Amino acid sequence: MGSNILYIEDNPDNMMLVKRALESRGYTLLEARTGIEGVAAAEKNELDLILLDINLPDIDGYEVARRLRGSVKPTLAYTPIIAITANALKGDAEKALAAGCDVYMSKPINIRELWARVEAFVPAPNQ
């Protein structure tokens, strides 16, 4: 498989949808179900991109992004983070960007938009 992408998401349906969509393009998707688990996975693995849900059961995605950007692992300061969230209120995108996310997407997930956003940072291995 190809480039490593970490998806931090507690909803199994969203996880499966994104996993299938990205693996069909040749990406390898690593999974984390909580914010704490996601930070640990990011610090343990070599990643090309992080997809981040904002509403997580332990710490929210904003805090996850801040921890990733401040990690002792230097590459996490520059690893692209795409926030994918149901939060679509005014100011949510700005809050995600201020926390360290590079791009903000709202749910429901549009697969073509997801591919375009991901491929802007990491070319698809199968394309």
Please annotate each region the language model reported:
Residues 16-24:
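Charged docking surfaces used in two-component/phosphorelay signaling
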Residues 57, 89, 108:
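The feature encodes the CheY-like receiver
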Residues 109-118:
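C-terminal output helix
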Residues 9:
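Conserved acidic carboxylate
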Residues 26-33, 41, 105:
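Short hydrophobic/Thr-rich beta-strand motif most characteristic of the beta2 strand and flanking loop
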Residues 53, 85:
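Active-site residues of response regulator receiver
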